[in-house]
């Protein structure tokens, strides 16, 4: 995750710890891996004390935290904190305050807003506890909570995608001349509005039809089921996450190119929006073909786990997030290497590193996950997804780099 150039210039810090690369990057990566292991065991691991990885409860929580961090950094530009606070406050204290605030707001959104406002007085499917209270057929504790968190995951993913897509494509237009809070609130509300529309079309039909009996007067049958070979909204999750990763990469790895070559802002933004959506769908379809080759069979209705269409679409998202994990490590911890040479060459090398690094992270996750994370052995298991760990890792890296300024090994703030 990165932020707009204005914020980057505003909050750049002077060098503080002069460790040369790649030592600073390797030390920070080692530090964050140790922290991620501790956080995972303490909050998510089936062998730990809290066991949030059900998996949807844990995944819903980390996606909500990621959404709030995006709001605070990309949309609100650290409001209500001042420039002096960001620049002059002790790095550890500043990071603790910003991360704690982000987590606190996320918990309020998930357990306060979704569980006890929306789920209690509106669409009940956002709240597992309210589904249990309803006494509906099949809504026992585990199923109800997983269903409620699934709805939150998909809604929050839509909000993240359309918020970042607008910021990357159009900045704060058409409110760029307004004051800081006005333009931030406008983009924030627009991202939520577009996310609700997308959720209603792409995910709500699946949610309405996952209950028994199907809620035929509340939603149309999943309109994508014939050619997606599944009623699951994971079909859309696959291409949205892939497109979201491309949005990240346009800023992080490609430095705004090629879309910034179009000088007319509205045209550049429109081309970017259309391009990443189309590319996301193409990546998902290509990823499915690669899995046909890797697993030795095509997906089909009624297949085993790795042959289920819904699992395949979700696995595309999982692989995209593994590659995003490699990209943020390169961007934040290794100064977005390489930084010399022509931009096309730099962008190509960074992209190859992110893709290869993502494949390596995926291999290590499935190989070492059962030992260090308590996950189930094998690449395809029911009720298991790597997305929870990957999003948690993205949060930790981003918070460490942006909130804590890479403390203690990074030599400068990398906002």
Regions found by a protein language model. Give the residues of each.
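Cytoplasmic membrane-interface regions of multi-pass membrane proteins
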Residues: 2-17, 69-95, 159-186, 208-214, ...
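Membrane-proximal helix-loop-helix units in multi-pass membrane proteins
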Residues: 111-155, 283-332, 339
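N-terminal signal-anchor module of multipass membrane proteins
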Residues: 1-72, 156, 391-397
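Long, acidic/polar, low-complexity amphipathic helices and coiled-coil-like
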Residues: 101, 108-125, 131-237
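Transmembrane alpha-helical segments of multi-pass membrane proteins
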Residues: 17-30, 88-108, 180-197, 264-282, ...
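Membrane-helix interface motif
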Residues: 34-49, 108-132, 197-220, 282-300, ...
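C-terminal transmembrane-bundle signature of multipass membrane proteins
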Residues: 30, 34-41, 235-253, 276-291, ...
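Alpha-helical transmembrane segments of polytopic membrane proteins
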Residues: 25, 52-69, 96-97, 138-159, ...
């Amino acid at each position: 995750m990165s932020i707009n150039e204005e914020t980057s210039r505003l909050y750049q810090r002077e060098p503080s710890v002069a460790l040369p690369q790649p030592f600073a990057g390797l030390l920070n990566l080692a530090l964050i891996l140790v922290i991620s292991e501790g956080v995972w065991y303490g909050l998510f691991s089936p062998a730990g004390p809290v066991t949030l990885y059900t998996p949807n409860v844990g995944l819903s929580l980390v996606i909500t935290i990621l959404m709030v961090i995006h709001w605070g950094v990309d949309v609100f530009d650290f409001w209500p904190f001042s420039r002096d606070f960001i620049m002059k406050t002790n790095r550890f204290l500043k990071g603790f305050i910003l991360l704690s605030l982000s987590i606190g707001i996320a918990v309020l959104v998930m357990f306060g807003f979704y569980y006890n406002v929306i789920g209690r007085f509106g669409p009940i499917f956002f709240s597992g506890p309210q589904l249990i209270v309803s006494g509906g057929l099949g809504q026992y504790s585990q199923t109800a909570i997983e269903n409620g968190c699934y709805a939150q995951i998909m809604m929050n993913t839509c909000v993240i995608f359309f918020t970042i897509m607008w910021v990357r494509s159009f900045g704060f237009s058409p409110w760029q001349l307004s004051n800081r809070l006005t333009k931030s609130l406008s983009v924030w509300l627009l991202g939520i509005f577009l996310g609700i529309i997308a959720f209603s079309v792409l995910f709500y039909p699946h949610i309405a039809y996952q209950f028994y009996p199907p809620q035929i007067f509340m939603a149309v049958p999943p309109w994508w089921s014939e050619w997606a070979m599944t009623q699951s909204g994971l079909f859309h999750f696959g291409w949205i996450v892939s497109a979201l990763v491309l949005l990240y990469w346009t800023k992080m790895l490609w430095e705004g190119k090629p879309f910034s070559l179009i000088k007319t802002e509205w045209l550049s933004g429109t081309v970017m929006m259309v391009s990443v959506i189309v590319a996301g769908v193409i990546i998902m379809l290509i990823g499915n073909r690669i899995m046909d080759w890797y697993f030795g069979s095509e997906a089909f209705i009624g297949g085993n786990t790795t042959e289920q269409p819904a699992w395949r679409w979700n696995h595309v998202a999982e692989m995209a997030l593994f590659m995003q994990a490699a990209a943020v490590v390169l961007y934040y911890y290794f100064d977005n290497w390489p930084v010399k040479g022509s931009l096309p060459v730099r962008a190509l090398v960074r992209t190859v590193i992110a893709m290869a690094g993502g494949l390596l992270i995926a291999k290590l996750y499935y190989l070492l996950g059962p030992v260090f994370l308590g996950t189930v052995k094998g690449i395809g298991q029911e009720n298991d997804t790597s997305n929870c760990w990957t999003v948690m890792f993205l949060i930790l890296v981003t918070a460490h780099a942006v909130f804590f300024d890479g403390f203690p090994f990074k030599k400068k703030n990398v906002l």
